[in-house]
């Protein structure tokens, strides 16, 4: 069945969230080393399969392939496609789409030396707990705390021709073209949807949210960067994943 609506969504802190935000009744969405790491709300578990039947569900996440594959989706809600590595790697039924990957590789091939050099120098910092190149596409650093992430970002802000983003204690360096907006544009070219809905919570999501016919955000933090007439802010006293899925189903109409 051709689905006329494309629902492109961030994952962490949008559809699922960590143990720090867990509430009674939440369902485990991810195990890591045997421990419950991520969670869905009960309403998300109920609504996500309905949404998956009515719209094309397309996660777009900074997660690596391995991190994405740890997610335990509700029955009937496993996405057929997902864009990992900030949109650089398309998984179709769990397998890498080689055409998509090759196109992404062309965007980053000339930057591989800079990526490796940046990784080497960032890894040497005492306030960086871990750093790596994700799927050959971008550099990621996990710092000891939020203040360390800000220091790390300040130290390398002008060091490479990349887009740098800070999210909590994490810092990302994305080469040109490795952003969620570019990924969504490429996906829309493939799927030709009539309408695009997007949900996200961080500055990394802004390029994707700007391309939406309707964008959904958890609060007003990102609103200055988005077209207000095409952006919905989560209602008070409603958990963001539930707000997102209620909105998607309302936009899709009767199933």
PLM ranges: what are they?
Residues 2-7, 11-59:
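Active-site neighborhood of HAD-like aspartate-dependent phosphohydrolases
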Residues 5-7, 80, 196:
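The start of beta-strands in P-loop NTPase/AAA+ ATPase cores
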Residues 18-19, 68-71, 93-94, 207-208, ...:
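Short glycine-/acidic-enriched loop or helix-start segments at secondary-structure transitions
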Residues 23-27, 75-77, 215:
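Glycine-rich, phosphate-binding/catalytic loops in enzymes
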Residues 38-122:
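Active-site phosphate-binding/coordination module
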Residues 57, 82, 196, 215-216:
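Short, well-ordered beta-strand core segments
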Residues 118-211, 221-222, 226:
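Conserved acidic, metal-coordinating active-site core of Asp-based
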Residues 219-255:
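Asp-based, Mg2+/Mn2+-dependent phosphohydrolase catalytic module
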């Amino acid at each position: 069945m051709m689905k006329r609506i494309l629902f492109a969504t961030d994952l962490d802190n949008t559809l699922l969230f960590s143990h720090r935000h867990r509430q009674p009744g939440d369902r485990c969405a991810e195990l890591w080393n045997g421990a419950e790491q991520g969670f869905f709300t009960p309403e998300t578990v109920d609504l996500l399969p309905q949404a998956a039947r009515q719209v094309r569900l397309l996660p777009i996440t900074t997660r690596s392939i391995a991190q994405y594959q740890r997610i335990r989706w509700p029955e009937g809600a496993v996405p057929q496609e997902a864009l990992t590595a900030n949109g650089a790697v398309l998984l179709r039924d769990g397998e890498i789409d080689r055409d998509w990957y090759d196109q992404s590789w062309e965007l980053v091939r000339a930057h591989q030396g800079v990526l490796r050099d940046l990784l080497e120098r960032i890894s040497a910092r005492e306030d960086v707990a871990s750093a790596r190149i994700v799927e050959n596409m971008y550099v990621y650093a996990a710092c000891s705390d939020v203040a360390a992430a800000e220091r790390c970002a300040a130290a390398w802000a002008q060091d490479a021709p990349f887009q740098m983003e800070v999210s909590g204690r994490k810092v990302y360096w994305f080469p040109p073209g490795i952003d969620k907006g570019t990924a969504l544009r490429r996906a829309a070219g493939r799927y030709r949807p009539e309408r695009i809905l997007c949900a996200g919570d961080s500055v990394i999501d802004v390029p994707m949210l700007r391309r939406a016919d309707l964008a959904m955000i958890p609060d007003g933090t990102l609103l200055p960067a988005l077209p207000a007439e095409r952006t919905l802010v989560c209602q008070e006293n409603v958990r963001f994943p539930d707000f997102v899925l209620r909105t998607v189903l309302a936009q899709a109409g009767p199933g």
